[in-house]
Structures are given as structure tokens and as C-alpha cells.
Amino acid sequence: MLPTILYSAILALSALTPSALAETRSSGCGKHPSLANGVIHLNGREYILKLPDRYDNNHAYHLVFGLHWRGGNMQNVANGESIQPWYGLETRAQGSTIFIAPNGKNAGWANNGGEDVAFIDAIIKQVEADLCVDQSSRFATGFSWGGGMSYSLACSRAKQFKAVSVLSGGVISGCDGGHDPIAYLGIHGINDGVLPFNGGVGLAQKFVQNNGCQQANIGAPPSGSKSSVRTDFKGCSKPVSFIAYDGGHDSAPLGVGSSLAPDATWKFFMAA
């Protein structure tokens, strides 16, 4: 009896070795994929899928959602209209990431009754059943209403997403839950006349609290300086940072050619 117990214990311990840790690998790993680049239809809605050029079905990839703004659409994100394609993240990913641009209802993310969060859930389920994804490495970013939807995911899906980057967002897609910690980056223009700067600060403060960070004053650059000031909160269980930049309600902070938001977002995601 004792040898049997010992043998079972050894098997249980062996399952915890790094080579056997498969819980973060999606069920699509090892499969020949049926999904391909382009527009995917799902439950009466649609999204754009972009795979790495050399997709390997045995390699677990990061998964990044790029969410469009009010009046925008998934093509704006994928093609780079008023922003760099995929918010500038695809070039920085260098083949490490699967990108998804969902299409909002009525060119927005009202998330009535949680329908947009449910749509994101359904996309994740479909993609990860077919493709190889590191399930501990999901991210979301977006501008304006896309930022609001990213914030909503931070509230309701903090255990499913590793980090979000909210560009000029507001509480416009709801905040169901909103008590769990998640890595949170906020980027906001000090002269935003659509979703005010102080509101963006308030979004970050929720996760300062959730993540147990030490309170700190958020710095801001002088108006007209064309510069930015970053605040990294200390003592957090998961990182929280906020970048204030000299600008308004801009889909590409400091201009489409600026590396500010793409660099900050990608580095934050990878360090989260």
C-alpha cells in the first residue's frame, strides 16, 4: 500500500514540473488551425484576426485585443487609420502575438447587459480552441470608447486578462465587478475635451486601490510642451502606471508617428 501511495505522490509532483505545466496553453496548441487571417464571423458579429507570419501551432502566443473608438471599426485598428496599425503593437511584437480587432455594435461599445464582454469571451473561446495561445498572456487596449471597453474588461475580467492599456478612456462601457487586481496602464491627454483628464486619473485610481499600491500624485507636463510625464505607482501587487501627455482627445498621443503609446503599452504588457 505504501509504495502505491508513494508512486502516486511522485506522479503528482512530476505533474508540477515546468515541462509538464500545460494549464496556460490553450486547447488549440498542436492543432492544424481552421481559423485564418481576415474577418471571422461569430454569433452574428465579427472580428479581424491577425496571426504571426510564421505561426507555429506548438508555440503559445500572446493574445492582444485592439478595440476601436466611437464611430470607428475593426478595420481602423487593423489597417491603422489615425493610428499605427494595431495601435503600433504588431511591429513591436515581432511575431510573438496573435492580434484581434473586434467590431463594436453601432460603431461603439455600449456593452448593454454585458453583451460586449460576452462577445470578447466568445472570441477567446473560439480562438483558443483552434490556435495556440498562452492563456496567462491576454491583453487589451483601445482609445476613447475602446479605452472604456478595455477598462470594462479590467473590471469584469481581471482574472482572464493580464493587463490593459487604456488610452483616453472613461466609464462608458460599465465596470461590472471592479474589485480584482490587474496590471493597469492609463494614457491621457491633459487637455482632453471629450473624456476629461481627471476622469482618466480616476480610472487608474480604482486599480491603485485594487492592487494595493501606495498613493502618489500623478504628474502632468506643461501645456504646450509636447511632452509627457509618467507616474509608476509603488508597492502594487500588480503594476499600475499613468502617462499624462500634452494633448487632447487623441487616438495617437503626440501624433501618429510618435512611439509614446506603442512603446509604453508594449513594454508594460511584457513586464506585467
Curated annotation (Swiss-Prot):
PANTHER family: FERULOYL ESTERASE C, PTHR38050. Involved in degradation of plant cell walls. Hydrolyzes the feruloyl-arabinose ester bond in arabinoxylans, and the feruloyl-galactose ester bond in pectin. Active against paranitrophenyl-acetate, methyl ferulate and wheat arabinoxylan. It comes from the Eukaryota. One of its GO terms (molecular function) is feruloyl esterase activity. The keyword Hydrolase applies. It catalyses: feruloyl-polysaccharide + H2O = ferulate + polysaccharide. GO terms for biological process: xylan catabolic process. It is found in: Secreted. This is Probable feruloyl esterase C. Residues 1-22 form the signal peptide. GO terms for cellular component: extracellular region. It comes from Aspergillus clavatus (strain ATCC 1007 / CBS 513.65 / DSM 816 / NCTC 3887 / NRRL 1 / QM 1276 / 107). It is an enzyme of class 3 (hydrolase).
